[in-house]
Amino acid sequence: MAGQFVQYGRHRKRRNYARISEVLELPNLIEIQTKSYDWFLEEGLLEMFRDISPIEDFTGNLSLEFVDYRLGEPKYDLEESKNRDTTYSAPLRVKVRLIIKETGEVKEQEVFMGDFPLMTDTGTFVINGAERVIVSQLVRSPSVYFNEKLDKNGRTNFDATIIPNRGAWLEYETDAKDVVYVRIDRTRKLPLTVLLRALGFSTDQEIVDLLGDNEYLRNTLEKDGTETTDQALLEIYERLRPGEPPTVENAKSLLYSRFFDPKRYDLASVGRYKANKKLHLKHRLFNQKLAEPIVNTETGEIVAEEGTVLDRRNLDEIMDVLEANANSEVFELEGTVIDEPVEIQSIKVYVPNDEEGRTTTVIGNAFPDSEVKCITPADIIASMSYFFNLLSGIGFTDDIDHLGNRRLRSVGELLQNQFRIGLSRMERVVRERMSIQDTDSVTPQQLINIRPVIASIKEFFGSSQLSQFMDQANPLAELTHKRRLSALGPGGLTRERAQMEVRDVHYSHYGRMCPIETPEGPNIGLINSLSSYARVNEFGFIETPYRKVDLETNSITDQIDYLTADEEDSYVVAQANSTLDENGRFIADEVVCRFRGNNTVMAKEKMDYMDVSPKQVVSAATACIPFLENDDSNRALMGANMQRQAVPLMNPESPFVGTGMEHVAARDSGAAIVAKRKGRVEHVESNEILVRQLIEEDGQEYEGELDRYPLAKFKRSNTGTCYNQRPIVASGDVVTKGEILADGPSMELGEMALGRNVVVGFMTWDGYNYEDAVIMSERLVKDDVYTSIHIEEYESEARDTKLGPEEITRDIPNVSDSALKNLDDRGIVYVGAEVNDGDILVGKVTPKGVTELTAEERLLHAIFGEKAREVRDTSLRVPHGAGGIVLDVKVFNREEGDDTLSPGVNQLVRVYIVQKRKIHVGDKMCGRHGNKGVISKLVPEEDMPYLPDGTPIDIMLNPLGVPSRMNIGQVLELHLGMAAKNLGIHVASPVFDGASDEDVWSTIEEAGMARDGKTVLYDGRTGEPFDNRISVGVMYMLKLAHMVDDKLHARSTGPYSLVTQQPLGGKAQFGGQRFGEMEVWALEAYGAAYTLQEILTYKSDDTVGRVKTYESIVKGENITKPGVPESFRVLMKELQSLGLDVKIMDEHDNEIDMQDNEEEDVVERKVDLQQKDAPQSQKEVTD
């Protein structure tokens, strides 16, 4: 027997065909969200308050400091926040200290800084009652980048950019005349030496001594028109502030504020780390030949002779000496932009492949520590040196698509940036208030205006591109949404500008970003998913784990190192499937491995690391596809994406052929109820589980407190599907921390269960499965195999209007008793009522405008009392095409103290309607391998082809759907699924390490099936066997969210566009079918004149004709001739607006009056075609 049984959770055993043992548990899959938010609360906020403190007034007398902060208790818990449509948040209180320096007085006060949204345990936020997810953003890391490109003559030109986290960019570039230029903040370019002079290197000789003599520098000095530091400063000022009178002082302060002011310029710790790494001498001197000896300044000993070629070993020795300040120079740049001395380290080396033996100077930035978040003059000099070195052939250009140069901004950092914007706006207000307020009586509370802070947080959660309505179609969709990485958003790329290179799969994605899962369409490659084992480090770079190889024994150790993409470039990594002996040594002498994006074979002694698992390459959703290795990548992409669209079924079932990921994905998705700590289940109900905590101390077990786990019952998810949780533990069970207590939607026994296992045959049947169509047995309808539950929410508000308040009531004008049969005495539908489209859910009347009364009418009113005020019916009705059973009704009243209602609303009624949708012709189905299709026919069970034992099959798929698509995984799944069903087991075939062909065939034989997996099928209609044996097996098939009930639509009469008077478009507007230009040509070609005439007039924009037609149909008369279409009048007006005097003549050359009197005629008849449920907006009008 191939494979061994593995336990997944409490209830499920699977036969696992993996050959590689798991050395590392999968991490918590939503850690990227929770960890980042925790960092924000613990460190990020504090960092922000530290950055902004102290705020001082313009005289320096008042100083405001933020000392500490705390989060209070949320006003409403999670469930209550969802019910009340409020944000799940806690009050943020900040301790503020105000110091009055004149008197030395200190005032401390705790200030309320607004309600701060809290993250739920499952990594989401509840904003205005809706669950939202903050997607992590992939951006270019702040750093120094060097780039090369060919000009039109085929010459290589270099350019460099220093990109900060925030602040001005600094760019270097060369031109055709070999002059090096600098651009400050995207302005016009200046010779590079102008910036050096401005920094304090005033003479040409100083500059040449600093950077080393070369032709590029000489050309640049010739081009440079300045000769002193002051001239250079004025030149820069004129470029940055054209039109303003330049002075040296202004120029100094401008240059200082652009680059050296911590409030204006921020490299961030990641930028400092990357810049130090790039400008560090060690990487730049590798394989270079020294042009001067290196001497240890303390001992006078020569560490490396002139002419030494530096390799890794002697570089390490030299670095130790350099760190002890050898070869370092200090320049005193007093009286310039920065008064501090500048320390650099420089070493002369020979230019590679140069016959004349020229030298160049390599300058490093003398390691500023990680606290220096600004750029320093040493950084600028070192980056210029790197640029000149590149021109001499020393150094490397950067690949901007490499994940070493792209980093993630997760929730915490995005929030921090948003909070910083709010605080800096607040800072301005505080400064202004400081100058106005009386210093004796001022308190911190009076100075602080929290509005900008609250507004910026609200704006971020409510309308940022990265704050998204959670995709809650099923647990996998939730999980994937939380692990999504987007290159779009503020500060990122735009769809239109993103080139092919950015979207493409890069070798550095290995183990960090999934190469499969990305949307099809304009966002392809810009939105990605985190790989299964990946994690994010403190700098925001994605790391992936590797097993360390002991270089002395060449054996794999238990040590696991997480490497970023640029760290990995220094090592040789072996594949996870390399065979090892019992001591952990490689068996083969030559091992398949990766080095810097090349897949190659190297000697086993050269290995540094080994992959931890074959599935570390792919994301959680892709890892749920069995036999992924046998599918074409394009189809695997569709398979991974379509799993997210699977509708939760009424009776879910986990797959016979899984991958072992189903349990982990279900546990971490947030849809299941997971035990917070070890305990014993005391009580289980459908809506609550009670667990008594068990504490172990000194070998004894004690009972602790009681944990309550409420379960969600038949709630509406964000996507309108049914969100229901079912307990899977019993009283008395002892549960461990992290164990699943209750299944969520699309789960069965603690595993993801997106679809059902059905018996599938690959065969044609009367052409009904042409073009990927699916033929299905009626048994699947009858037995509710693919039945799903859908819940829609409708709401109606009673507001205060100018003419008086709206009223929710059963007393509605001009409505028959039968229309009110489902309403209670309040005028609200009762729970359990069955409603169809057009039925009233909430009766509501709105006051009409009262006309001015005559004196006689007023007298009569005074005598006989108030006449009933005129009201119109604005009841909430079931929209077109909806309907079902009323599941729940929620009523919120202002009088009863519901303070969450929006202004002007007195009462809010929410009605939930549930539908049970069976599978239909027209519904979309799919497997897990990108094999999708639409149901074309439901065949009676007795007509379906049947197996030799008489069992009818469930689904017929077209065999032509397999070869051209190259997703062979579905065929292997089919065979293994049938074997698993016959053996009564579940199996796991992990990605890239699953069941081999031999495993599949041996399992088939074990199940007593034919070795080729085919069987004789009999036609259910005739009882005859089909000519050939057919592949029949069990495939896991999903019902997708694209259901025909949501798409089918037909219009009778309805709303019309205000301008063109033509029917609106789309199902939501109850619109018509567009009959466009080409369709008109088709009818013209057929000569169908009358059909064409009625389409262009009555059915479209002949406003008079359509009313008369309706009237004629009602009265049973002949239909009158059509009038003039409104679009013709619009054309006339357009021509008149161009100054053309257009007249319309009849065949006798008499002018036709376009101001038709028929319209007034229609108004007099008052034919009211108003559709009660037609949506009314400014764009629409209803006849």
Swiss-Prot record:
The cross-references to Pfam families, in alphabetical order and at most eight, read: RNA_pol_Rpb2_1 (PF04563), RNA_pol_Rpb2_2 (PF04561), RNA_pol_Rpb2_3 (PF04565), RNA_pol_Rpb2_45 (PF10385), RNA_pol_Rpb2_6 (PF00562), RNA_pol_Rpb2_7 (PF04560)
**What keywords does the record list, in alphabetical order?**
DNA-directed RNA polymerase, Nucleotidyltransferase, Transcription, Transferase
EC primary class = transferase
Q: Which family does it belong to?
A: Belongs to the RNA polymerase beta chain family.
> Which Enzyme Commission number(s) are listed?
2.7.7.6
List all Acidic residues biased stretches. Answer: 1153-1162
GO annotations of cellular component type: DNA-directed RNA polymerase complex
This chain's protein is named DNA-directed RNA polymerase subunit beta
